[in-house]
Amino acid sequence: MEMDDDEAILLDDIYALASTPNQTIVTSSFPQTVSPGFLARRNEALAMVEVAVQSTILILTVVGNAAVLAMIVSLSRHKDLGRMYTMIGHLSCADLFVAIFNLLPQLLWDVTHRFRGGRVLCKLVKYVQVVAMYASAYVLMSTAVDRYTAICHPMRSHTWTSTTAHYLVIGAWVLALVFAVPQLVIFDYVEVVPGSGVYDCVDHFRPRWTLPVYITWFALAVYVIPLVVLATIYLRICVVVWKSANRKSTPMINVAARTSGATEQPSLDDASVSFNVADGGGVDLDPSGGGGSLSRHAAQLSHRQQQQQANNVVLSRAKTKTVKLTLTVVISYLVCWAPFFVSHIWSAWDPHAPFEGTEMVITLLLGSLNSCINPWIYLAFSDQLRRKVTQCCPRSWGQRPSTLSHDSTDFRSGSRPTHS
């Protein structure tokens, strides 16, 4: 079938693919390879479905994440919400960035079929689209690191504040901005076929082997490496939670056994030391009765002993709930983006990969769905956010009891301030 000029692929001057089975098109944030059959003619029915689905995802992503951010800002005016809500706010900001700078440009591009913005806008759009993808993954890793510190090293909560969490997220964004720089070189606004008058924003790789190498690097940096890091962190967290669950029947630590030379061991009513993880790993001395010598011994526990004891106490229900929330967000990210990266890596290295236009569009839509469902995950695990929604929409949502469990509502328990 002979192609029209408007539908022709970029040949000698750009792609130099006259003898290769697969050729490159751009329907996502970075290059991908598909068979020449897909390039011959745009499937208008598929394009209409893609535009409709992308529009729905875009609207839900913006509304959902903007609502979560507004609720967090409103709640923070009345009290310190702790680091977990800080990280949820950063995740929502990253998802909004994905919606505005990745989904929206892609939607407009799908509507017009050809890019209409010129050379500068072409490079800028392709750059920020990939920045959004890097940032989404790296902010997610920052959240995992924050939860790892709170659960596995509770004594660090005194120094690991919300400001520290902000710096961690800033580092994630800096990495995203740096790693996306190759997009500025790879993409350009060129005439599809010399003399045709039809321009588009396309990628150009010379030599051609750099195409699969770049796609592989992108998949490693955005998906595979974060997958390994997240799996390692949450494996460690799950081990700590599991060990804590096995000790749930002994939340108080009797320090009488540590008193050398004692012939009698006072009961917990005489003296006890309580390590409150939810309150940042502080130590509560509770002397009563005739346990004066025991109290003096407990007061002389070294910081190292305190940290060892704090790491062995039962985790609060609130912190366990934050682990469930962030783990759900991580699983959602991995599941939604897995088909996208698997199909692109496969197509990059295998000329006969079984992926055509329809399959590529579906994988792209699945990846876009991730930013859309995250706000619902936050609402599912946060009683406080749900209660805020109820207060804003009492008629449609119905009134809920105001006496909720403090630990499940605030992602923490205890009466003293905490940064976790």
UniProtKB/Swiss-Prot annotation:
It is a multi-pass membrane protein. Residues 399-420 have a biased composition (Polar residues). Gene3D superfamilies: Rhodopsin 7-helix transmembrane proteins. Residues 76-83, 146-166, 234-328, 382-420 are cytoplasmic. CDD domains: 7tmA_Vasopressin_Oxytocin (cd15196). Residues 1-54, 105-124, 188-212, 350-360 are extracellular. The chain crosses the membrane at residues 55-75, 84-104, 125-145, 167-187, 213-233, 329-349, 361-381. Keywords: Cell membrane, Disulfide bond, G-protein coupled receptor, Glycoprotein, Membrane, Receptor, Transducer, Transmembrane, Transmembrane helix. Nephridia in clitellum region. It is found in: Cell membrane. One of its GO terms (cellular component) is membrane. Glycans are attached at N22. InterPro entries: GPCR_Rhodpsn, GPCR_Rhodpsn_7TM, Vasoprsn_rcpt. GO terms for biological process: cellular response to hormone stimulus; egg-laying behavior; G protein-coupled receptor signaling pathway. It holds the Pfam family 7tm_1. SUPFAM superfamilies: Family A G protein-coupled receptor-like (SSF81321). Disulfide bonds join C122-C201. Belongs to the G-protein coupled receptor 1 family. Vasopressin/oxytocin receptor subfamily. PANTHER family: G-PROTEIN COUPLED RECEPTORS FAMILY 1 PROFILE DOMAIN-CONTAINING PROTEIN (PTHR24241:SF161), NEUROPEPTIDE RECEPTOR-RELATED G-PROTEIN COUPLED RECEPTOR (PTHR24241). Receptor for annetocin. Activation by annetocin may induce egg-laying behavior through calcium-dependent signaling. This is Annetocin receptor. The lineage of its organism: Eukaryota, Metazoa, Spiralia, Lophotrochozoa, Annelida.
